[in-house]
Amino acid sequence: IATQVDCSEHPKPACTLDYRPICGSDSKTYSNKCDFCNAVMDSNGTLTLSHFGKC
């Protein structure tokens, strides 16, 4: 099981509408890697991956 997501290409100005949910350490479900990685960048790295799938 992967415990990290590679956010090196983020943040991005726009994300696709793909639905591949990721649960963040803030107990929020992000709709895909792009949404999650943008939030990670906004949090200055304090947000981490909890698990793949809905929270």
Curated annotation (Swiss-Prot):
Disulfide bonds join C7-C37, C15-C34, C23-C55. The record marks L17, D18 as: Reactive bond 3. Keywords: Disulfide bond, Glycoprotein, Protease inhibitor, Repeat, Secreted, Serine protease inhibitor. The keyword Secreted applies. GO terms for molecular function: serine-type endopeptidase inhibitor activity. Pfam families: Kazal_1 (PF00050). One of its GO terms (cellular component) is extracellular region. Residues 5-55 form the Kazal-like domain. PROSITE patterns: KAZAL_1, KAZAL_2. Glycans are attached at N44. It is found in: Secreted. CDD domains: KAZAL_FS (cd00104). InterPro entries: Bifunctional_prot_inhibitor, Kazal_dom, Kazal_dom_sf, Prot_inh_Kazal-m. The keyword Membrane does not apply. Avian ovomucoid consists of three homologous, tandem Kazal family inhibitory domains. PANTHER family: OVOMUCOID-LIKE-RELATED, SERINE PEPTIDASE INHIBITOR, KAZAL TYPE 2, TANDEM DUPLICATE 1-RELATED. This is Ovomucoid.
